Amino acid sequence: MIKLESLQDPSPRKRRTKLLGRGPSSGHGKTSCRGHKGDGSRSGYKRRFGYEGGGVPLYRRVPTRGFSHKRFDKCVEEITTQRLNVLFNEGEEITLDALKEKRAIDKHAIRVKVIVKGELEKTFIWKDANVVLSQGVRNLIGVA
């Protein structure tokens, strides 16, 4: 025989769903648990994540820790002489735009530095002020 104290609440999967708008005796009739007027009573309304009813949200109450220069950093890329030998032909002009076009550097780069790795097998035209040559590359091409 089943006793009253031995009854258990059904598991969440078997629990009956809340029926809304089915008359006053259901306890969820008329406004369907949405209250009167305001955004929350309207269809399609969703409160954004972290909203605390107009109070100062947690992410603003907690103090910031540290500081990052990431958003202020200037994007300076490096490219090797070995890579330039592969990407460019003899006598070609090496510019920032040409390097971006060949996807040798990041599209957000504002300057590129050429560093030595292997020999410089071809001669190139260096006119772009944003393409900086390292001391080793200057020695290779004979520019002091």
Swiss-Prot record:
What is any one of the record's Gene Ontology cellular component terms? cytosolic large ribosomal subunit
Q: Where is this region: Disordered?
A: 1-48
Q: Does the keyword Ribonucleoprotein apply?
A: yes
GO biological process terms held by the UniProt record: translation
A GO MF annotation of the entry reads: structural constituent of ribosome
Q: Which SUPFAM superfamilies match?
A: Ribosomal proteins L15p and L18e
Q: Which UniProt keywords apply?
A: Ribonucleoprotein, Ribosomal protein, RNA-binding, rRNA-binding
State the similarity comment.
Belongs to the universal ribosomal protein uL15 family.
Q: Any idea what job this protein has?
A: Binds to the 23S rRNA.
Assembly notes: Part of the 50S ribosomal subunit.
Q: Which PANTHER family match?
A: 50S RIBOSOMAL PROTEIN L15, LARGE RIBOSOMAL SUBUNIT PROTEIN UL15M
- The protein's name in its UniProt record: Large ribosomal subunit protein uL15
What is the organism field in this record?
A: Chlamydia caviae (strain ATCC VR-813 / DSM 19441 / 03DC25 / GPIC)
Gene that codes for this? Answer: rplO
